[in-house]
C-alpha cells in the first residue's frame, strides 16, 4: 500500500470497488469485502497491477478468509437507462446490501459514494491504499473476467476473452463488421454508431 491511509474509527469496515465502467459490453460488476483482522492476506494490491495467476490465488484466499464478501452488478440495459455512473452506484449499493454482515463503515474506491444506510467515505486510488478495497477490486475483476470468457464462448468472433469488452481496435473492427450483440451497451458511442443511433 503506497501512502498511509488513516482508517475511520469503526470496528467493521467494508471496502467496495467496481470493474467494467469502460467496456462496451456486459455488466458493471462491483464487490464489497469485510476482511478478518485476525487472518491477514499478504500481497493485496490493485487488481489491475497483479498477474492473472496471482489475482486468482488471492481471489480464492479472500473467499476463504474474509469475514464477508458479496457481489453487485448492473446489467447493460440498466447502464443504458441510467448512465454508467448511476448504474455503478446502483451496483455498489447492491453489493453492500448483499453482505452477510452489516458493516458500520464503508470505504469506496474513487471520488463518489452511493447513498448507503451507513457512513461511507470515497477514497481516491483506494484500490492501492486500502486493503478492503483492494480485495473488492480482485473479487470484482476475477468475476467479470470470467463472465467475458463465457461470453467469448457464445460469441467467439469478438475476442471478448482477450479484451474483456474494452474498445480495442480489434473489438471496434469486429463490432463494425458483425454488429452489436444483445450484451453490448447501446448508449456507448461506438455501439450507437454501429446501430445507426448516433
UniProtKB/Swiss-Prot annotation:
Record-linked Gene3D superfamilies: Ribonuclease H-like superfamily/Ribonuclease H
Transmembrane segments: none
InterPro entries xref list: RNase_HII (IPR022898), RNase_HII/HIII (IPR001352), RNase_HII/HIII_dom (IPR024567), RNaseH-like_sf (IPR012337), RNaseH_sf (IPR036397)
Main location: cytoplasm
Catalyses which reaction(s): Endonucleolytic cleavage to 5'-phosphomonoester
Subcellular localization: Cytoplasm
Cofactor(s) recorded in Swiss-Prot or TrEMBL: Mn(2+); Mg(2+)
Cofactor binding summary note: Manganese or magnesium. Binds 1 divalent metal ion per monomer in the absence of substrate. May bind a second metal ion after substrate binding.
Binding residue positions for a divalent metal cation: 17-18, 109
Family indicated by similarity: Belongs to the RNase HII family.
Protein name as annotated: Ribonuclease HII
Organism the protein comes from: Pectobacterium atrosepticum (strain SCRI 1043 / ATCC BAA-672) (Erwinia carotovora subsp. atroseptica)
Amino acid at each position: 500500500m503506497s501512502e498511509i491511509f488513516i482508517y475511520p474509527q469503526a470496528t467493521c469496515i467494508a471496502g467496495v470497488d467496481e470493474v467494467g465502467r469502460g467496456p462496451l459490453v456486459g455488466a458493471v460488476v462491483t464487490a464489497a469485502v469485510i476482511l478478518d483482522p485476525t487472518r491477514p492476506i499478504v500481497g493485496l494490491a490493485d487488481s489491475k497491477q497483479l498477474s492473472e495467476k496471482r489475482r486468482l490465488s488471492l481471489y480464492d484466499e479472500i473467499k476463504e478468509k474474509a469475514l464477508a464478501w458479496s457481489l453487485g452488478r448492473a446489467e447493460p440495459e440498466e447502464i443504458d437507462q441510467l448512465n454508467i455512473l448511476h448504474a455503478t452506484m446502483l451496483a455498489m449499493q447492491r453489493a453492500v446490501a448483499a453482505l452477510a454482515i452489516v458493516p458500520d463503515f464503508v470505504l469506496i474506491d474513487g471520488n463518489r459514494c452511493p447513498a448507503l444506510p451507513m457512513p461511507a467515505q470515497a477514497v481516491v486510488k483506494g484500490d492501492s491504499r486500502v486493503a478492503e478495497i483492494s480485495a473488492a477490486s480482485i473479487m470484482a475483476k476475477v468475476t467479470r473476467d470470467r463472465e467475458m470468457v463465457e461470453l467469448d464462448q457464445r460469441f467467439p468472433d469478438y475476442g471478448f476473452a482477450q479484451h474483456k469488452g474494452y474498445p480495442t481496435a480489434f473489438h471496434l473492427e469486429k463490432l463494425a463488421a458483425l454488429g452489436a450483440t444483445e450484451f453490448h451497451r447501446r448508449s456507448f458511442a461506438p455501439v450507437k454508431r454501429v446501430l445507426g443511433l448516433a
